[in-house]
Amino acid sequence: MGLSDLSKTPGQALGDMVQLGNVESVIQWGRSYSLWPYPFATACCGIEYMSTACSDYDIARFGAERPSFSPRQADMILVLGTITYKMAPVLRQIYDQMAEPKFVISVGACASSGGMFHTYGVLQGVDRILPVDVYVPGCPPRPEAILDALLKLQTKLKTQGLEARRQEVMQKIQELNERNKPLVVR
């Protein structure tokens, strides 16, 4: 974890202190270790996220220590808990306000599939309104599972180019907009 990760990218090494490579690999490395999370907590998964951010698990080791409470200053949203149909347009609006490139982690059974709340008022999976990058299983998931999701997202950021990421997200959003016209507020 560090500059030694750059040695896995195409380029030349000049001694121990200098690494030559392309700019995109440096940007991908930097972006993967400087995520600004926006926790959207509505249930018990939010409590597990709080313990993940505290000293016992220390999410700061992975570069996501600064939670942002303004979507305009965040690039990763963690959906933690049950999302109702009344909340869905608000969540989508928050996602649209986030800085590019933006990432989504669906934490827990309620956010991923509606959980035990299979009712008319609960959205059966946040992937119906947002392009989810990583799913975290559990009810509630343990802090280790949330950290594992963060590591999976970092791996994805290191391997996927910026343009490929942009195209993937735009395609997912277009599909979501076509499927869920009543949920999307513009």
UniProtKB/Swiss-Prot annotation:
Instruction: Name its GO BP terms in alphabetical order.
Output: aerobic respiration; electron transport coupled proton transport
Name the coenzymes or cofactors required. Answer: [4Fe-4S] cluster
Top EC category: translocase
Which reaction does this chain catalyze? a quinone + NADH + 5 H(+)(in) = a quinol + NAD(+) + 4 H(+)(out)
User: What EC identifiers does the entry list?
Assistant: 7.1.1.-
Q: Where does [4Fe-4S] cluster bind?
A: C44, C45, C110, C139
Free-text cofactor note: Binds 1 [4Fe-4S] cluster.
What does the UniProt keyword field contain? Answer: 4Fe-4S, Cell inner membrane, Cell membrane, Iron, Iron-sulfur, Membrane, Metal-binding, NAD, Quinone, Translocase, Transport, Ubiquinone
Q: State the PROSITE patterns in the record.
A: COMPLEX1_20K
Topologically, how does it sit relative to the membrane? Peripheral membrane protein
Q: Which GO terms describe its molecular function?
A: 4 iron, 4 sulfur cluster binding; iron ion binding; NADH dehydrogenase (ubiquinone) activity; NADH:ubiquinone reductase (non-electrogenic) activity; quinone binding
Give the UniProt subcellular location, in the record's own words: Cell inner membrane
Task: Spell out the NCBIfam families in the cross-references.
Answer: nuoB_fam, PRK06411.1, PRK14814.1
Q: HAMAP family from the entry?
A: NDH1_NuoB
Q: What is this protein called?
A: NADH-quinone oxidoreductase subunit B
Q: What is the lineage of its organism?
A: Bacteria, Pseudomonadati, Spirochaetota, Spirochaetia, Leptospirales
